[in-house]
């Protein structure tokens, strides 16, 4: 009936009628008053007096009858002046003479649409009595459920499925997805275990009194869920519960966190003082390391996580910012050990997952799974711009950015933008100096793994990319692509100043410096500047005296390869002269 947090407009001393009768009769909702109020926005709750659970229980039958008459009269007046509303659930119950029930929240907590409460549902007409303990609920806003064919109002609540147990292990109550008809269907949802079968009591064997919540351990019945909450507050102080099988601890007010269910195979919440246990159907067997609750928000003075009486508590080591597993090679940290193991394979080169059809190896099982699809499915994702096909839709999406020119990933240090996140990560290593990929042969380190792969071919002599025109082989595919332009004559890079074209973009960049006069490569010893880095390297050999190029005919050394080639031509000329 209305929101429990709203206070009546009048008060009286405990034991007296808690609102003035004159206020209801004279100032409540007569047609004249409603017509005057209709100049502004008016709702039915504006003419409704709400009671808390304690206030309602203090009313005697005559006072409850007076309240029923006044509220029904208010509703009739409200409709008579032209207000069109759905009949409130409270009015329906008053018309049928049913006993009202109210929600009750814990002290010092404001009413929230999604709040942890302890709720007691009493009998529903002639159906078997039911008592439901709800730890977390949400109000029904758009959807409506039904209980035994009767629609639930918007102020009703729905609950996760819980089972309440006594200290001797027997079932007291069973609650299905909203409100169950009987206890027996729970057997199928609990797996039909014989261990549970003997302990379950049907509603015929043990019925719960409509206005009480049984508390077997202390030997008395508590009159309301409010008394139960107060009793638990005094009997069960905030304490820390530890589970010694994995040395993990959890903190919750008077409730043992269902950590043990990961080890025992059952999901329970144990009130340690009174031995009442709530069992939850869902998520059985899930370790709480993987569970998180949105409402866990505060910490106590010891740095331990506190939670607001909810179904799940976040395990201390599953916090999003905690990364306890550190890579010994590069220092990167991870939340899970499995992530660290996969990451370490980058450094070790281990590839344990091997394709049984082609023998190709992978670091991750997911990569192997995607690869195996190439043998069965091919490349189903086709680019409409260039006709290239891909195995994965995500790869096609990234490829589209090459046509659109989109560069969504920007470096925060220098502002450079990239079309792929992996390119940005590689680029950022130029700022940090990190070189995680190391050659096992010579110890040289590289920023990119592809650069390491190409470098390793200098040790093995492997040149897998072969030109179909002349048969020349190359260790990089990009080098082969540049070489093939010699045969095709393609020069796609054109200078906007003079119109000259080039096969490589790098050569065009160097050519631009002729027009701009830029000489960015300066010698640190003499200050002479050059437009090309290769010219600077050649110049620096003058200072060092280095002459690495030797003539095989006469043994003379040169600092530049071009000078050696020019020199070798003199030997060929002399040979032709003597012939």
Curated annotation (Swiss-Prot):
Region entry Required for transcriptional repression activity, spans: 325-579
Composition bias, Polar residues: 27-36
Gene Ontology molecular-function annotations: DNA binding; zinc ion binding
One GO biological process term: regulation of DNA-templated transcription
Main location, first listed in the record: nucleus
Pfam families for this protein: KRAB, zf-C2H2
C2H2-type Zn finger ranges: 241-263, 325-347, 353-375, 381-403, 409-431, 437-459, 465-487, 493-515, 521-543, 549-571
Stretches for region Mediates interaction with TRIM28: 12-135
Location of region: Disordered: 1-37
Protein name (Swiss-Prot/TrEMBL): Zinc finger protein 382
Species name: Mus musculus
Gene this protein is translated from: Znf382
């Amino acid at each position: 009936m209305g929101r429990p947090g709203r206070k009546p407009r009048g008060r009286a001393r405990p034991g007296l009628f808690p609102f003035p009768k004159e206020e209801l009769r004279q100032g409540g909702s007569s047609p004249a008053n409603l017509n005057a109020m209709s100049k502004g926005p008016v709702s039915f709750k504006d003419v409704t007096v709400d009671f808390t659970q304690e206030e309602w229980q203090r009313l005697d039958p005559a006072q409850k009858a007076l309240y029923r008459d006044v509220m029904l009269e208010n509703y009739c007046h409200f409709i008579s002046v032209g207000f069109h509303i759905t009949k409130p659930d409270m009015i329906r119950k008053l018309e049928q003479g049913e006993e009202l029930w109210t929600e009750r929240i814990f002290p010092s907590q404001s009413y929230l649409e999604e709040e942890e409460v302890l709720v007691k549902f009493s009998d529903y007409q002639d159906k078997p009595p039911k008592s439901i303990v709800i730890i977390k609920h949400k109000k029904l806003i758009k959807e409506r459920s039904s209980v035994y064919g009767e629609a639930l109002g918007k102020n009703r609540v729905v609950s996760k499925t819980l089972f309440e147990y006594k200290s001797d292990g027997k079932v007291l109550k069973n609650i299905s997805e909203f409100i169950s008809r009987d206890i027996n269907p729970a057997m199928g949802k609990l797996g039909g275990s014989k261990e549970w079968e003997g302990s379950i009591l049907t509603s015929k064997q043990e019925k719960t009194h409509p206005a009480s919540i049984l508390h077997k351990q202390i030997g008395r019945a508590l009159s309301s869920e409010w008394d139960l909450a107060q009793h638990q507050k005094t009997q069960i102080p905030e304490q820390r519960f530890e589970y010694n099988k994995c040395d993990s601890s959890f903190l919750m007010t008077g409730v043992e966190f269902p950590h043990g269910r990961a080890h025992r195979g059952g999901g329970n919440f144990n009130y340690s003082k009174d031995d009442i246990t709530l069992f939850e159907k869902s998520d059985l067997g899930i370790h709480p390391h993987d569970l998180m609750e949105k409402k866990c928000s505060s910490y106590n003075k010891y740095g331990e996580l506190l939670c607001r009486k909810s179904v799940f508590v976040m395990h201390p080591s599953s916090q999003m910012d905690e990364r306890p597993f550190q890579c010994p090679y590069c220092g990167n940290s991870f939340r899970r050990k499995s992530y660290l193991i996969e990451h370490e394979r980058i450094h070790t080169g281990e590839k344990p997952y091997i394709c049984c059809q082609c023998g190709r190896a992978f670091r991750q099982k997911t990569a192997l799974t995607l690869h195996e699809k190439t043998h069965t499915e091919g490349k189903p994702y086709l680019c409409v711009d260039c006709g290239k096909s891909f195995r994965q839709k995500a790869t096609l999406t990234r490829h589209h950015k090459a046509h659109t020119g989109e560069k969504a990933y920007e470096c925060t240090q220098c502002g450079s933008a990239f079309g792929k996140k992996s390119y940005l990560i590689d680029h950022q290593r130029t700022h940090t100096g990190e070189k995680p990929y190391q050659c096992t042969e010579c110890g040289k380190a590289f920023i990119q793994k592809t650069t390491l792969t190409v470098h390793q071919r200098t040790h093995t002599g492997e040149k897998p990319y072969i030109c179909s025109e002349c048969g020349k082989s190359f260790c990089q595919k990009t080098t082969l692509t540049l070489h093939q332009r010699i045969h095709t004559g393609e020069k796609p890079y054109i200078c906007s100043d003079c119109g000259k074209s080039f096969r490589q973009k790098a050569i065009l960049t160097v050519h631009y410096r002729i027009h701009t006069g830029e000489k960015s490569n300066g010698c640190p010893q003499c200050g002479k500047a050059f437009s090309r880095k290769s010219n600077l390297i050649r110049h620096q050999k003058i200072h060092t005296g280095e002459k690495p190029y030797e003539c095989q005919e006469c043994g003379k050394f040169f600092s530049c390869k071009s000078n050696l080639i020019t020199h070798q031509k003199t030997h060929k000329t002399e040979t032709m002269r003597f012939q």
